[in-house]
């Protein structure tokens, strides 16, 4: 069964901020590679929504949130029925659990 992945506006904003940072620091090619990698990892959730791991935050885990690691980034998501909602995309070196 294929699930539908919906990237919420907050996650799109996060992705754009990351893209802008990589664009300034390393150029457009690197920025596009990073964004493409993050989106390809998220896309895998269409087939494997349980492939993510628990977050380091008990509250998020209690409410069914999971995360997938995209090299230096993490996507926080929750599956509700047949839809996987992406809530945030953050750098793994930040306190990303405090985004909620």
What is each PLM-predicted segment?
Residues 43-69:
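A short, surface-exposed loop/turn module that caps and links secondary-structure elements
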Residues 70-100:
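Enriched for short, Lys/Arg-rich terminal
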Residues 4-6, 33, 39, 62, ...:
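PIN-domain endoribonuclease scaffold, especially VapC-family toxins
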Residues 1-36:
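Arg/Lys-rich, positively charged N-terminal/basic patches that mediate binding to nucleic acids
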Residues 5-7, 38, 77, 86:
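Hydrophobic packing within well-folded, soluble alpha/beta domains
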